[in-house]
């Protein structure tokens, strides 16, 4: 009967151990993020597992947001904005989405944390000429400034990197 040499058994154990270590090393970060309450969308589509810097204003100042912050922002978006802004589109006005291009093109631009918070506190039409009645005014009693900043961070990150966010047209899904 064939008996493997000691070194052959050792290599087998070493390979098995390395495989287990490698699997643990690749699975552990995702498991840790999930345990911290990070939404998989934030990891997979917003590509944030740690922190991200986002523009606070047009003077180049930035603020750091964590994956947990963006998860909270996503939750706020789902609870308060998703009915009109599915996937970054704008159902009441499909010509103006939450794409980065459209956010930058608004008057005034809405492509920073501060400008999005200001818009949500006092919504204006896309050209800035009049009050917007299609977007609800968000009072301090409804969402705090910190919550609005977190919501704005989610929108800006999605607009920058999420596939399909704010696309201009949807494929016809009818058979």
UniProtKB/Swiss-Prot annotation:
Q: Has keyword Manganese?
A: no
- Please list the residues that bind heme c: 81, 84-85, 135
Q: Which residues cross the membrane?
A: none
**For this UniProt entry, what's an example GO CC term?**
plasma membrane-derived thylakoid membrane
Entry's induction text? Present at very low levels (at protein level).
Looking up InterPro entries in the UniProt record yields: Cyt_c-like_dom, Cyt_c-like_dom_sf, Cytochrom_C550, PsbV_cyt_c550-like
Q: How does it sit in the membrane?
A: Peripheral membrane protein
The record's GO molecular-function terms, alphabetically, read:
electron transfer activity; heme binding; iron ion binding
Q: Which keywords annotate this record? A: Electron transport, Heme, Iron, Membrane, Metal-binding, Photosynthesis, Photosystem II, Signal, Thylakoid, Transport
Q: Which cofactor does it need?
A: heme c
Gene3D superfamilies linked to this entry: Cytochrome c-like domain (1.10.760.10)
Where does the record place it? Cellular thylakoid membrane
Instruction: Give the family, as the similarity comment puts it.
Output: Belongs to the cytochrome c family. PsbV subfamily.
Its function?
A: Probable low-potential cytochrome c, can partially replace cytochrome c-550 (PsbV) function.
Which protein, by its recorded name, is this? Answer: Cytochrome c-550-like protein
Q: Which gene encodes it?
A: psbV2
């Amino acid at each position: 009967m064939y008996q493997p040499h000691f070194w052959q058994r050792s290599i087998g154990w070493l390979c098995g151990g390395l495989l287990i270590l490698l699997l643990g090393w690749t699975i552990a970060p995702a498991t840790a993020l999930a345990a911290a309450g990070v939404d998989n969308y934030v990891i997979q589509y917003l590509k944030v597992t740690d922190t991200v810097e986002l523009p606070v204003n047009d003077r180049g100042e930035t603020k750091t947001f964590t994956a947990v912050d963006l998860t909270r922002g996503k939750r706020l978006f789902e609870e308060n904005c998703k009915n009109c802004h599915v996937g970054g589109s704008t159902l009441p006005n499909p010509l103006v989405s939450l794409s980065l291009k459209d956010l930058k093109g608004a008057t005034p631009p809405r492509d920073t944390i501060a400008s999005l918070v200001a818009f949500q506190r006092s919504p204006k039409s896309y050209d800035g000429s009049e009050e917007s009645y299609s977007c609800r005014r968000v009072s301090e009693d409804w969402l705090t400034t910190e919550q609005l900043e977190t919501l704005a961070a989610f929108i800006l990150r999605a607009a920058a990197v999420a596939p399909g966010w704010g696309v201009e047209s949807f494929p016809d899904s009818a058979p």
